[in-house]
Amino acid sequence: MAVSVDDFKYIDTSNEPTDQTAVHEKRLRAFMTALLDDVTADRRFELVPSSCAPNCPIQGPALRDRLRAASQAGAQILIIGGIHKMSTLVQLARTAAIDTTSQRVVFRKFFTFRGDNDEAWQRAERFVSEEVRDRLPESRSQQ
């Protein structure tokens, strides 16, 4: 199955006094790199490079245009998502997999994770990655 993964967006509404923008950007890049590596290593999938620039989820083209571009590049599924830091301890990761032809959401899932350090982000990435990769073949077979 050909899959494309757009960079996730990150939002911090925790109102913490310290500006953590740089560290969050670094952790999000590491999260995305690990997710792409996981998809690449999984023989069930062929990773199609994203046509979206790194800041695409926030300032890029509309989702329908991103789906069209992913489809034209050969992807059957486009994975999108974001992470929202809600408080000092709690973050929410959202993911969705969308069929690029029908533009139908194949699955959508919300994950919460605790902590805002490298270890917490790595744990979250492993869990999100496993869930996404396990759900993709299952959801495609139900179409």
What is the predicted function of each stretch?
Residues 40-80, 91:
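Short, solvent-exposed, polar/charged sequence segments at loop or secondary-structure edges
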Residues 76-117, 123-125:
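Amphipathic beta-strand/beta-sheet edge segments enriched in Tyr/Trp
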Residues 48-54, 114, 124-130, 139-143:
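A general structural signal for short secondary-structure boundary/capping elements
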Residues 55-61, 95-113, 133-141:
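A short, terminal or domain-edge coil/loop segment
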Residues 1-42, 135-143:
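A structural "domain/chain start" motif
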Residues 28, 32-36, 95, 121, ...:
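Extracytoplasmic/secreted envelope proteins and their assembly/folding machinery
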Residues 5, 30, 34, 42, ...:
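Extracytoplasmic
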